[in-house]
Each structure stands twice: as structure tokens, then as C-alpha cells.
């Protein structure tokens, strides 16, 4: 049943309720164009009630178009009226509540929030002032947040042209604004291992005294930080004493994030925590974690709760890359959209939330700006309502933030954006459909262009289509060029590769710049370095990466240019090798992580590996490298099980490595069916100088090893490549007949 709340009245009972009434009235005016009345029906009452269980809970009593929202104070009342708004449809002057929302509401998790630090590296926050931060607090509270996290010290970061304030100045007035809403304030405050204890305590004392509200301090153990694990906890204990002498109710939450350089950090950390220091209130885990989450919970004394620090903002080179459970995000998107693009990933983060929920008391996400806005709402809603339907959350997101649009269509569009990133974009016509969803909503409601959240989603949808169209077009050119090359007509092959895009492509590309201008004015998001002062190309500067190669077209053109100075006969032989770079004969095998993914390897990789993605680096993906080399697998071991090799035949194994070898160690090895093929210094084997010179970019090298017929078992081989200290970094290999 639906309920008409058009031209509603609002009344308040209690001091906090009066302030909540003012905030609620502003929300109604923003959506309906008028403020609520003081008397009459329909009616909503906001009531302060000390009998409510805690300040994070609220009660809604509904009788038709008469609603009573009860809470202890301002926090719960904001949750209550926001929940009402999440279930309302606004159409012109009409307000329709879509269902009865009576109930007692309490959160699943104690800690629910997001980081919003003011420094030079975020893609949005550095452009904000008090008005934007206050709006942000209200928006995240609409989905149940009770804490924000600031960064009071800029550290080594320098202010950029967008920053109007000093980070500490922001921390002061931002914490004051948060306090008005009874929102907890956490501070991410790293230790400097070069700073002596006296200086560290003195500098922090000034911050603690300056900020009106501090509820928690989060010193990361690493990323950044290089202190030993035991020294780190001892320093945190001292800081905690200083903190609590100024803010008695504030808590100390160090993180179990370890410096890469310190292999004993986890044990040193635990040795201090096992002494049960009273000054430590809980432990945080996040990127560069010293322990897997279940291992941390098993080993950490039970008196210490764990707070999660989920990275919901990054796509590659991070703790939870796109498709983190299989790490197969296609290089066409990874190159062009890069590490910090607009990234709604609702189903992925629902999975992550379900995996981590049993271990933690809550979370404060790692965020660098507006690009992860959908993820914030999804994560927070699950922290409050763990069993909520994901589709319902997305419809709530649309009704609350994009009230001009059809909520179900926006929810479908957001899910569509996530589905756009499945598989090879050239094989995903769904990408065009997703864009049509947003374009259709814009046609029905042009005022959506005034809503930054809609423009952000539209921007992403158009980016995806641009990549889809470019990759499809270029793959067709490459197929034709290969046909010409196979007949020896390299001039026609080259001409085919030089074919330009059509006019529609350039219109679509230009629209991205237009949307970027709008978004910069609306929310301050920085979509390139030159025009909007992004901190760098991987800091959400999508316009600086969107045009990077998504096929081998640029590399093939580069190879044609390299052949221009060669004699004709040599030139043709060279170009033939270029076009046949990855070609294999019957009974041979070629593997590229970028082109083929892990699924073809017949065995799961061991431990926590890292993909050192190269494709969004303009100095790498500039025509000097084929797509097959863009993903570099970084781990202590690489394993695979292969078959189909011919009996009684000797083979060669050629592996392409990233140039990260370390001559300190002689423990690099390659095994085939358990037998040592090579063991010694990096990388051993023989050099294939011609292949390296003609086919590899300068960051890579290759080595060739013998695979005698005796190591194969009925045409099968299990390969293991590894090194126990620093690991190996490889991108491709080929097994071919000797």
C-alpha cells in the first residue's frame, strides 16, 4: 500500500528534534520545492525518546499518513527521517511513501563510516569546504553511518591549487560540523619513524587540543610507516595516554598493516599485543595487512575488537581489485579507466561484506572522493541492515539522491555499470544498453544534469561505450591487417591500421570533457591533471588514461615505424615475426595473463598474489608494448598444469619477466613435473636476444630454458616458477619445440 505525504506538516518534540526538523525540512524543500507546514495532515512527528535502546537506533510508528519517528537524539532522528525519504517517490509537488515503514530499527555493526580526509591526493575532498563536508555527512548518515574519518596532518603532501585550507584547519571545523549531527570523528594519523617520541607526542597534543571532537585515532602500522611492530605499539600506547588526557572518551585503534620491508613485523606486533595493553581499544585491518583477517582474529587477544578498513575506491594495484575473487578485469578497461575511476561495484562489495562480517565490529572505508559514492551507500547499508536486498539498497540510493529519475531504472543502470566490466568489452553488447538507460532517464528529466551523482554515472557509462566501440573497431582493423600481412602485402596492412574513427566516436569522446567540466563545478571531482588539478594520472584522472591503447593496433603501427629503416627483405621478415609474435604450432603452448587469465592454467595460484598492472601507465602503454604483456603476475610462486605436448619431443620454455631481479639471492627456480629445470640466480637460462630486442619493452626481459622430453608425462607438464625471498614477476610464457 502507498501513502500520500504531499504538503506534509512536521512537528518536533525535544531540542534535538527541533534541529532534526530543520534539517528534514531542508531535505523536503530540495526534493518537493516547498517546506513542510507546521500543522495539518499528513503529519510527521520527530520525537526525542530516552527509552530508545541507544543513539544508533530509531523507531517508526505509522498510522496511514501519520508518522512518528522516535530516537534518543539527533543521530537517530536523522536515520529515521532519512529512511522515510529513502522510501518516498517525489513527482512535482507530490510525495508518495511506497510502503508502511513501521518498525524498530537497530544497526548490526557498531562502527559504520567512511574516510574523507582533506589532503592533496584525493580526487574530490581537496576541493571541498564546510558546506560540502556538511552535506556529505548528512548524505552518508542517510545510509546509517555514525563516523567520519579525517586526516589532520598533511604529512609530506603539499597543498594543491584547489586547497583553500590547511588540513588541521579542516579537521577542526569538520569535527565541529560532525558534532552538530552527533557523528563520531576518527583521525587517520600515521607515525613517522624518523620522528622522536617527544616530538610525536607534542605535535599530536596540539591536534588533539585543537579538534572539538575526537572519538578515535587510527595510526597505520604501515602504508605509510616503517616502525618495527613492537615499537609501533609502544608508540601508540604513549599517544593513547596523551589522547585520553585531553579527550577521555576517545579510543586508540592502531592498524595491523605491515611495512613491506619488515618480515618480522607481525610477530613483533603480536608480542606487544599479547601483553594486553589497556591503552589500546581495538585493532584495524586493511591494505597491506600483516595477517589474513581470520588469522588476525585467531591470534589477536579476544579483548580487542577488529575494525575493517575496506578499500572501496581502487580498481587495480590494490587489496580488492575489480573481480578480486578471480582478478580478471579486462585490460581494455583497466588501462583506460585505471585505478580510481567511477566504480560502482555493488555485488562485489556485497560479497566482500559477507566474507568479512563475522570477524569485525564495523568498518570505516578507505575512500579518495566521490568516485566510489555508490559503494559507500551499499557498504553502509549492509553495516546497518546486513540482510538487505542489494536491489532495494540501490533503489533507496536512487530515491534519496536521484529523486527526479525512476528508481528501478537507476538501480538497473548501476548494476549494468558493474556488468559492463565483465569479460572482453568487445564481446559485451550490454555496454550500449547500460548507456541507453541513463540517456533515457536524462531525456525524461533534463534536470538530472544538475545532479552530480547522475552526471557521474552518465560519465562512466559513456566511458565504457567509448572503450567498447574503440576496441571493436580496432580489432576489425587488426583482423584485416593480418589478412594483408599473411599475403605479404604489408603496405595495405599498414594502411588498414591507420584508418580513423568515425565522427560519432569523436562526438562521444568530446562529451566526456563536457561532463568533466560539469562535475568539476558541481562536486570538485578532478578528472584530469591539467584542467582540474588531479594529483596524478592514477588519482581518478580518467581523461588522462581514456585514450590509451586497448588493442595491439598502436604496437603494430610502432613496429611498422621501426621497420622503416630496414632493408626490404629484412623488413618483411621482421614484420612477419611481429604479426606471428604469439603464434604456436600444433603441440605447443602460449600463455599471457592479460590475454588468457588464470582460468586456463589448470591450477589455483598459491597465497596472496599481486598483479602489477602496466596498462594504465602512459610511459608503458604508449605503442611500445603489446597487450599480452600488460599484466605482470607478482608472487613467490607461479604454477600451472598443461597438456597436449607431443611424445619424445624436446621443448623450450621462454618466459617474459619484468626487470625486477635481485642478484642478492640464488634461490630462483623452475620445476617441471617436480624436476629442477633451473635453480640459481635470476633469471638464468639463455637469452633470446632477437625476441627481446624486437618484441619486448625495455621494462621486460626474457629467458629460455630446456624442457627435455624426459620431463613430460604422457604429454602433460606441471610447471612451477618461484623464488622464496622476493618472488617472481612474469607476464607471459611460451613452450615450443626445440
Can you describe what each PLM-predicted range is?
Residues 67-71, 97, 452-463, 630, ...:
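Generic recognition of long tandem-repeat/solenoid scaffolds
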